Amino acid sequence: MSNKMWGGRFSERPDEIMEDINVSIDVDRHLYAQDIAASKAHAAMLAAQGIITASDAKNIGKGLDTILSEITKGAFEFKRALEDIHMNVESRLGELIGPAAGRLHTARSRNDQVATDFRLYVRDTIDDIDAALAAYQHALASRALDHAGTVMPGFTHLQTAQPVTFGHHLLAYVEMAGRDRGRFADARKRLNESPLGAAALAGTSFPIDRHATAEALGFERPMANSLDAVSDRDFVLETLSAASICAVHLSRFAEEIVIWTSPLVGLIKLSDKFTTGSSIMPQKRNPDAAELVRAKTGRVIGALNALLIVMKGLPLAYQKDMQEDKQGAMEAFAALSLAIRAMTGMALDLVPDEARMKAAAGEGYATATDLADWLVRTLKMPFREAHHVTGRIVALASKQGVALHELPLSAMQQVEPKITADVLGVLSVESSVKSRTSFGGTAPKNVASQAKGWLKRLEKQRK
C-alpha cells in the first residue's frame, strides 16, 4: 500500500525511479514563504465562509507560523518522500496540530496551490529585480553626470564614427534599464491575478470566496477561468522574456567593458575589486566580472527557451511537465539579479582614461560629419554634395597622414575653393560634441540635464 497523501487509490509503493523523477522538493522548497502565506489566506477564507471552524483556522495559522519560523531558522526537515513543498508543510502541520491540518486542503488542489505559490514568487522576484535595476540606473546616471563633458569615441561597426561623451554613452544604458523595468512592470501587472480556488481544474462545490483570498495575497482579482488558472505559465514566460532582454542589455555593456579595459584599447580601468589575476601569468588583470555577466545571459535566455519548449504542446489543464517550470526560471532570475549587482558595482568602480578617450575620439577622421555639416550650413551645399566633398578631403588627409584638423586650409581648398578658415573651428572633438544640441544628442549640456533628470526621477521613485 502506498503511504502517500494521495495514496488511497494505490495498492503498491512507487518504484524508486518513479520517486526520483517525481520529487520536486529540492527546487520548490524555495517557495516555502509563498506556500505558507497562501495557506494562511486560504484557511482564513474557509473559516469566514463557515467551511471550517474559527478554532481550526486559528490552530492552522499558528501551526503555519511555527513552520515558517522553523524553515527560516534552518530547523525544518524537508523530506523527499513527501515530494514537494505542499506536502512537506501539510505533513509537518499535522504533526503540530493534529487532524485539523487535514482540513486545510478543503476546496484546494496542489494544481491551484503551486500556481499561486509560483505567481507570488515571481511577483516578489520582479520587485527585487526592479529595485536592483533602479540602483543600477542611479549608478550609471551619477557617473554620467560626472562625465557629461568627457569626450570619447562613438562607434558604429566597432569603428570610430563620431565623438560623443562618456556620460552620453552611460545614459544609453540608463534608458535600456528603464525599458527593462517597464517590461517587468507590465509582466507583474498581468501576473497579478490569483489562481487560488480554481482547485484541480474545474473549480469547487464549496462556497469559497476567491476574491477574499486574492485580496489577502495582494492580487488584483481572481483568475476568471479555472482551467486557465491552473495551466497558465505565461507569467513565467513573460518575466523570463523581460529578463532575457535585460540580460542582453547587461551583456552589451559588459562586452564594452571587456573591450575598453584591454591594454590595446585602454579607455577605462577597473580596480582590483572587479578583476582577477592569472595562476601562471603574474602581470594579468582580467575583467572576469564583466565576462561572467556576459556569460550569464545564456543561462537566462536558455531558461526562456526551455520553458517555451515545455509548454508548447501541453493540452489543458495541468500536466506534470509543468513541474519543470521552476528550476530554470529560479536559476535565471538569480543569475540576472547577480549580474545587475555586478554591473552596478563595475559602473561605480570603473575609471575612464580621459586623455586616451579624447585622443581616440579624434582618430579615424571622426569629425568628418562636422565638416560636411559646415559645408551645408555655410556654403549652402546640398548634403549629398557635401558628403562627397568631405570624402575627398578625408582621402587627402589620409594620403598625407594627418588628422582633419591638421590638414592645411590650402589643401582643403584644393578640393573646394570656397572653404574658409573658420572651418577649423568645427573640426575639434570638443566643438563636435558641443554642437550636438538636438534633443537626445551628446552635447554636454544635454547630457548633464538628462542625468539630473534621471537622478531626480529615481530619487522620487525611492520615496
From Swiss-Prot:
PROSITE patterns: FUMARATE_LYASES. One of its GO terms (cellular component) is cytosol. Keywords: Amino-acid biosynthesis, Arginine biosynthesis, Cytoplasm, Lyase. Its EC number is 4.3.2.1. It comes from the Bacteria. One of its GO terms (biological process) is arginine biosynthetic process via ornithine. It holds the Pfam family ASL_C2. It catalyses: 2-(N(omega)-L-arginino)succinate = fumarate + L-arginine. It is found in: Cytoplasm. SUPFAM superfamilies: L-aspartase-like. GO terms for molecular function: argininosuccinate lyase activity. The keyword Nucleotide-binding does not apply. Its main location: cytoplasm. Belongs to the lyase 1 family. Argininosuccinate lyase subfamily. This is Argininosuccinate lyase. The lineage of its organism: Bacteria, Pseudomonadati, Pseudomonadota, Alphaproteobacteria, Hyphomicrobiales.
